[in-house]
Amino acid sequence: TPIKSSAASDVYKRQVLAVVLIVVLIIFGRSWMVQKNAQKEYEKLSAQVNDLQNQVNDNQINIPSDTQTETENVAQEVQTEDSELEQKGIEIPQKNLNWKKLKGVNQDIYAWIYIPGTGVDYPVLQHPSDDSYYLNYNMNGTRGYPGCIYTEKANSKEFTDFDTVVYGHNMRNDTMFASLHNYEDQTFFNNFPYIYVYTKEKVLVYEIFAAYK
């Protein structure tokens, strides 16, 4: 009868809806777990770096010393750069990064970016062949959010290019590059004007002159 047919149809629809909801919950649950585990990896890595802050840095900058003259020139250049920073009142935050351990976590880690006042305190990676790899993959190789902070292979790992583009997700939980939105506030912009990039050989200081979306 039409009534029985309608009732059977309603039961079928409810069953289909239940299956769809279960599938959606599984997908979102898996995505949430991947993101949570990846964030734990970052927190663990940051904790390891912080634990080293009061220890002696086992990776002091090695100045080339092929000749006495070359050594003196390099030392003079470093002293000049330090003097310029002092004149601007810039004090570089100390990060005793253990590059051997960082490479043990992921061979593609080649720098560390730190922006005071934000949550940006992460390793920087560069995949040797796939520019978008770390958009979708985490440091431990799992696929999903939050991915990694990374540059494309067109940019030098020495940060010698005229422009270096650093990529990172705008996460809703305020991790990765989400906290850069703080620079929409002029007071915050004025209070935190510098970006620090650490490599095995040097520390680079960038002054922020503009922020927009």
Predicted regions located by residue number:
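Single conserved hydrophobic/aromatic residue that forms the stacking wall/gate
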Residues: T1-A8, Y12
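Solvent-exposed, non-transmembrane regions of membrane-associated and secreted proteins
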Residues: L21-K213
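Hydrophobic H-region at the start of alpha-helical membrane spans
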Residues: D10-I22
